[in-house]
Amino acid sequence: MKEQMKFVRKLPEPIEVQQEIPLRAPYRKLKAERDQAIEDIMTGKDDRLLLIIGPCSADNEPAVLDYCTRLAKVADEVKDKLFIVPRVYTNKPRTIGKGYKGMLHQPDPEGNENMMEGIKAIRRMHVHVIEETGFTCAEEILYPENHRYLSDLLSYGAIGARSVEDQLHRMIASGAGIPVGMKNPTSGDLSVMMNSIEAAQNEQDFLFHGWEVHTTGNSLAHAILRGYVNHFGTSMPNYHYENLKKVLDLYGERTLANPAIVVDCNHNNSGKKYMEQIRIAKDVMASRRYSSDVARIVKGLMIESYIEDGSQKIGEGVYGKSITDPCLGWEKSRALILELAELV
């Protein structure tokens, strides 16, 4: 059988795209300040709650900028209690490889795949978010090769449930230079997540993009609990008090820096019932109030939110409505943010 792979075109190097779409000096300083604030939260120097919130998929630059502009206003209202990082996710993992895979693949969700244009579109959008709202953002590190196109713009990274066992993802996380959350796998096996955190915190040597690479380890690699699927295909949560205590105990069995948990309030924790995110977020806050140990280790929440409630199919054309997983609409999101600030 012949190799079933066609090399379509050579893509530009990350440094070339960074030079074409640069981040200007004042915003590089802003990113450094935001990076330090998040590091202080993860290391316990700052007792604010990290809130990573935004669309399931950042599919449309005008709507994403609109959302982040609204978010910036409420972020200023709660800045003493919450540190907000927009999730601007431009890659979408697909279980069977079909469907919309994010702006990286399709700058126009209704158009053809064009990764040459996609690379530039996602960088341009992240730069515009920083310049227009003052936010540096979170992204999923779905493709290790893609990270360096955005690495000078991002303040938080996540390794997804399907990628967390992959050696290259763990090694990239070990050199990312920002906090990287390692999600529990879809099976719910917490040992996989903990192994991934340990690998990311260690020094690593590996081959990448034609280079021999050495990393010094990422002391801010940490756990993200996102629920799981049992043997019957049913969504099972892992955000409850006993789940948080279990991860605290697992950290205690290892020599890891900066024990931390971020709870993903959607995905299998909510069974993808987006309205459940409100209840789940409050439940986690109650666990933090009940136990000082839980309060110390639960550093943040992750919420899927956009301008309009729910989701739509590609082509329906509702502005600010998710074309992937259902999200909380803006009014509910704003009310939740204000309530969470009162609960910190």
Describe each model-derived feature in a short phrase:
Residues 1-42:
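N- or domain-start disorder-to-order transition segments that initiate the globular core
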Residues 2, 68, 81-246, 267-272, ...:
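Active-site-facing alpha/beta catalytic cores
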Residues 50-63, 325:
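Conserved phosphate/anionic-ligand binding catalytic regions in large, soluble enzymes, centered on
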